[in-house]
Every structure is written in C-alpha cells, then in structure tokens.
Amino acid sequence: MMNVSLKLSFLVFILVIMSNLGSEARELAGVNEIFEIAARSSNNAGTARALQQAPPCKRDVDCSFECPKGGFCNDRLGTCDCF
C-alpha cells in the first residue's frame, strides 16, 4: 500500500512540474500575449469567436452579450458585428 501512495505522490509531482514548464514556454514564446490581445479586442468579433467558439448568431438579439455597445448579426457569416 505504501508503494502505491509513493507512486501517486510522484505522479502528482511530475504533473505539476510539467504544467509549470508548459506555462513558462508559452510566456517565452509570447503565445499568451497573442491570445490576450485577441480576447480583449472588441472590434474584431471573428477572432474572439474563434478563440471562445461562440455559437453563430441568427438574430440581432444574439449579439447583445458579445457587443456591450450594441451590434447586429451578419446573417451570411453568422457573426456579430459590433458598433
């Protein structure tokens, strides 16, 4: 039984180390910065939709949550165009 608990604690330790290394690699490569800029951009609804995978709009009311200042639904593309 002691052997199992030792393996489990070692596995948790390895997982924590690996997740920290992945986070540092993303910071060094600048990937986090690209995602933050795209998520903050309210003028580019297409990029934010690609990152968050929001369902396509069908009516102007569907864009009320994506566009705090208002917007309209582009029926052809299924995206919200914000004002």
UniProtKB/Swiss-Prot annotation:
Signal sequence bounds: 1-25
Which species does this protein come from? Arabidopsis thaliana (Mouse-ear cress)
Q: What name appears for this protein in its UniProt entry?
A: Putative defensin-like protein 257
Q: Which Cys residues form disulphide pairs? A: 57-73, 63-80, 67-82
The primary site where this protein sits is secreted
**Location relative to the cell:** Secreted
* GO BP term, example: defense response to fungus
One Gene Ontology term, aspect cellular component: extracellular region
**Superkingdom in the source lineage:** Eukaryota
Q: Does the keyword Lipoprotein apply?
A: no
For this UniProt record, the keywords arranged alphabetically read as follows: Antimicrobial, Disulfide bond, Fungicide, Plant defense, Secreted, Signal
- What family classification does the UniProt entry report for this protein? Belongs to the DEFL family.
